[in-house]
Amino acid sequence: MEKIAILRWESGHVPQGLMQLEQLPGNSTNPASYPFPVKLVEVKGANTDTVILHPSQKLLEDMIQLAKELEKEGVRAITTSCGFNAIFQEALANAVDIPVFTSSLLQVPFAQALVGRDRAVGVITASASSLSEKHLRACGITDEMHPIVMGLENAPEWSKIFDHPDDSFDMDLVTEEILNVARQGVKDHPEIGAIVLECTDLPPFAHRIREELDIPVFDFNSMIGHVAMALSIVKLY
């Protein structure tokens, strides 16, 4: 049986561009991204508005109920398909007795420890304007860490998910936009020693970012892989 459950957005409420990204190897909602089975669970009412733009208390209550049901079914850990669920991290983790890891932002303190106090961690997010102090604090990110947040919401192709959700992505354009945000971030902030990709649709681009910038890049897959090893769902030896 599937040992890790991924709480995902409701079908019919996912922007067309993100549905394209779901087909890529490495995407959080593509089962082929993992060397172990995962259980994808739709959360009714989960969408751009209720997760990113206006985090919903009702949605949180529904997620808690689903988490409890999954725990009873024997699932050993629960994650989510959007890094902005970080704002629900404490409530979800407190609601069940199995590990809950809502967002790749949980890796920022780890990355900061790796690069040392004189360097910074860059965070590439779907929307910098929506990523609040509450999201960061929920993941253990303190004032002393000073992560450098780089948003994609002003990139014309990417912004379709907010402004024109029924429009498809030009995949070449959106790929270049993602890479450019990473390039420009490191150019403007040469102190960046590692990057964390908040958005769970960005892991398919992580290899390109690593190759171009030659720094560690953490994403949803590095997080779920870490937990899978901790639970012996996968083994290195």
What are these regions (language model features)?
Residues 1-58, 127-169:
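N-terminal glycine-rich anion-binding loop in soluble enzyme alpha/beta folds
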Residues 10-13, 77-88, 104-107, 126-130, ...:
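Gly/Ser/Thr-rich loops at beta-strand to alpha-helix junctions
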Residues 52-69, 173-182:
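Glycine-rich, highly charged phosphate/nucleotide-binding loops
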Residues 57-66, 84-91, 95:
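N-terminal active-site wall of soluble small-molecule enzyme domains
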Residues 71-74, 112, 186-188:
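Non-catalytic positions within long, well-ordered alpha-helices that form the structural scaffold/packing
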Residues 91-115, 210-228:
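Short, acidic/small-residue loops that bind anionic groups at enzyme active sites
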Residues 173-207:
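Charge-patterned, long linear interaction tracts outside catalytic cores
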Residues 198, 202, 218-237:
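C-terminal functional extensions of proteins
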